[in-house]
Amino acid sequence: MLLCRTEEEAKHALKLATQARENAPWYQHEEIGYNYRMSNISAGIGRGQMKVLPLRVEQKQAIFARYSENLKGLPLTMQPKLDCAKPNRWLTVLLLDADCGVTPADMLGRLNEANIEGRHLWKPMNLQPIFADCPFVSVSEKPVCDDLFARGVCLPSDTKMSMDDVDRVCEVIRGMF
């Protein structure tokens, strides 16, 4: 399911999801399109989930706030919030300070020992083996995406987590510094 601010955005998204074919008597494409479609079952599940979306966002924001409060003062940064945005906090990510002496692998190993699942931040496309021979352009010597990958950790943030669960994750992380 895709939510759009305007009907024009919705029409453009539908165009891209249906191969971006132009209104011509032949297959003509002025944009790269895709063949994305959602099954009726998936659409029905998505519609049903819309009823609980405000609650889920509230839960995710509470989890993020708890992490932020509990991890305050450590050599790491939580995701920032722009004044012009209301983040849904779908994913909670921390960035370790470059000189903190702890790597994402260290942190994930310690969390794993405590039976807590965490993940590396997504590996950038330019570092994927399949794209090794493809050109990559960056405005800086060290691309932002590479830096985020090198320092980022995705923390558990399922809406079924209790605040005690979040506190336990934080306790393990605090024990590393």
Regions found by a protein language model. Give the residues of each.
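PLP-dependent aminotransferase class I/II
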Residues: 5-177
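Glycine-rich phosphate-binding loop of ATP-grasp-fold ATP-dependent ligases
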Residues: 1-2
